Amino acid sequence: MSITKEFDTITAISTPLGEGAIGIVRLSGTDALAIAQSVFKGKNLEQVASHTINYGHIIDPKTGTIIDEVMVSVMLAPKTFTRENVVEINTHGGIAVTNEILQLLIRQGARMAEPGEFTKRAFLNGRVDLTQAEAVMDIIRAKTDKAMTIAVKQLDGSLSQLINDTRQEILNTLAQVEVNIDYPEYDDVEEMTTALLREKTQEFQSLLENLLRTAKRGKILREGLSTAIIGRPNVGKSSLLNNLLREDKAIVTDIAGTTRDVIEEYVNIKGVPLKLVDTAGIRETDDLVEQIGVERSKKALQESDLVLLVLNASEKLTDQDRALLNLSQDSNRIILLNKTDLEQKIELEQLPDDYIPISVLTNQNINLIEDRINQLFFDNAGLVEQDATYLSNARHISLIEKAVQSLEAVNDGLALGMPVDLLQVDLTRTWEILGEITGDAAPDELITQLFSQFCLGK
């Protein structure tokens, strides 16, 4: 799909396939009204006012057969998401009826939209920039209200405004430096230019570094904390997973080795999406299937943001327990002493002091796990500050890091006394990198790749 403004009319089903109360088939483009009218029996859609909902029936124009009773929303350019004429046909939910209407629209001249093409048109037509387009998908994929709050702020343009303002300031600085270089007749112009460049570069770097400090929190809220639940067999890992999920997703029995693979689930812990990985018990085993699960568990431990190490408080520490304590000591780890409802035999003096005694059976102290996670990753601060702008997208984070590196190169050059005109190159590069975030300077291949990750109909 070429990166140009496209004027053909596209269509797609915008609701999930399957049974439901309603289904929505969307059209966008110059001929959206004419194509919709060709299959609609009711008011003349080409003559109704913009942003109205119109009752009628979808019919097969060849046979006159009624396909469904519908409500049709008409929205005229440019006051639409794509800045093109948009029609949304609200049908009864169901695979057959929505597909039948989609095929009718295609036969009448619409083209099947590619994934993300509606949002791509909004970007190409200047309705949203790249950060706002990405925020659309973040809202769809948000697993908690906090993640949704960050995505909505980004869609509203908070990150775009910050980036655009910074780019404009960089441009102003480059222009001033250029003027000073072009008019060197003043004796102190070189000193003035160096001082200006040093002051502004440090200002830009400070701003971007402050933005990067939000990345850890933002990325966690967007993508979730990858959390490995580890422990030797039969200490209560799967029961803990089920307790956190509040539903039976892992197999729980009294037979060691029941969880023979890695089970992944998401759970909302005070607004933080935890990607819980219930690992097979880590122990030496001759069972090939279970051995594969154990190896995957070790890998999950290495790749996790957080480790929940479950020990059995009703038994003495084993060599396997000690091995797991050593294996996880460099991780963000929470030690959980399970089965405290039974007589305790575990040697507490051999454990770090920050363990949490719990009973999955009686639900004792489960809430303390949530508090400890907040302490570990958010320093007990609020998860989302209302007026703050957060970085949460890995692409944005990477580009901001590159921009900071370019600014550091300017500062290093100033310290070495390099000519100002050479330092302009790195400052210009910073301006270009920031433009990639909003899409002002993003390569065509990147734009195509980003929108291809969207769902159909969006």
Curated annotation (Swiss-Prot):
Known cofactor(s): K(+)
A single Gene Ontology CC term: cytosol
Annotated ranges, domain TrmE-type G: 224-378
Keyword Nucleotide-binding included in the entry's annotation: yes
Broad class of the protein's primary localization: cytoplasm
Binding-site residues for K(+), renumbered to this chain: N234, T253, I255, T258
Keyword Transmembrane helix applies: no
Gene Ontology process terms (BP): tRNA methylation; tRNA wobble uridine modification
Residues binding (6S)-5-formyl-5,6,7,8-tetrahydrofolate, per UniProt: R26, E88, R127, K458
Broad class of enzyme this protein falls into: hydrolase
Location(s) in or outside the cell: Cytoplasm
One family name in Pfam for this protein: TrmE_N
Entry's EC annotation: 3.6.-.-
Family: Belongs to the TRAFAC class TrmE-Era-EngA-EngB-Septin-like GTPase superfamily. TrmE GTPase family.
Known function: Exhibits a very high intrinsic GTPase hydrolysis rate. Involved in the addition of a carboxymethylaminomethyl (cmnm) group at the wobble position (U34) of certain tRNAs, forming tRNA-cmnm(5)s(2)U34.
Listed name of the protein: tRNA modification GTPase MnmE
Organism: Streptococcus pyogenes serotype M6 (strain ATCC BAA-946 / MGAS10394)
